[in-house]
Amino acid sequence: MDLPGPIHDFLLVFLGLGLILGGIGVVLLTNPIYSAFSLGLVLVCISLLYILSNSYFVAAAQLLIYVGAINVLIIFAVMFMNGSEYYKDFNLWTVGNGFTLLICTSIFGLLITTITDTSWYGIIWTTRSNQIIEHDLISNSQQIGIHLSTDFFLPFEFISIILLAALIGAITVARQ
């Protein structure tokens, strides 16, 4: 989306805060329904970030597949679970939580140092200079369609056969 700088930055910060708060909600909320709704918020914010970076096809696929199907399936599965088992034994802190906190904190620290030490200016200019000339002639979804019907035709058909076999297997297992 071609927005002025301050509006783009505001939306980027707003969506980033939505991602962070939704992620915290997924991890910290004890009710699985609320946790699934927080996951839906995270997936919608990711889709809006794709729109903000001019990837409209990926944003539409994110909304349709993850928010529309996967999150609804998670909520559907959570509603069938027994909700009383989550409130019986609630330990505030265990050894596994401390170990996980240590690993996640160290990964976060390494990620922050990597981001601050990387020269992003050179990366931006090298990706812009290597753009394909076809980019201006046809849209992203047309490029995806052309590649799926020419270069990736065989893998695309192979994946569709594997998904069909998995669907038939799931129906067979569900009937038994």
Curated annotation (Swiss-Prot):
Keyword Heme: no
Annotated TM spans: 10-30, 32-52, 61-81, 92-112, 152-172
Bilayer disposition of the protein: Multi-pass membrane protein
UniProt-listed Enzyme Commission number(s): 7.1.1.-
GO CC, alphabetical: chloroplast thylakoid membrane
Entry keywords, A to Z: Chloroplast, Membrane, NAD, NADP, Plastid, Plastoquinone, Quinone, Thylakoid, Translocase, Transmembrane, Transmembrane helix, Transport
GO molecular function term, any single one: quinone binding
Top-rank EC class of the record's enzyme: translocase
One Pfam family here: Oxidored_q3
Chain's role: NDH shuttles electrons from NAD(P)H:plastoquinone, via FMN and iron-sulfur (Fe-S) centers, to quinones in the photosynthetic chain and possibly in a chloroplast respiratory chain. The immediate electron acceptor for the enzyme in this species is believed to be plastoquinone. Couples the redox reaction to proton translocation, and thus conserves the redox energy in a proton gradient.
Family (UniProt): Belongs to the complex I subunit 6 family.
Quaternary data: NDH is composed of at least 16 different subunits, 5 of which are encoded in the nucleus.
Name listed for the protein in its UniProt record: NAD(P)H-quinone oxidoreductase subunit 6, chloroplastic
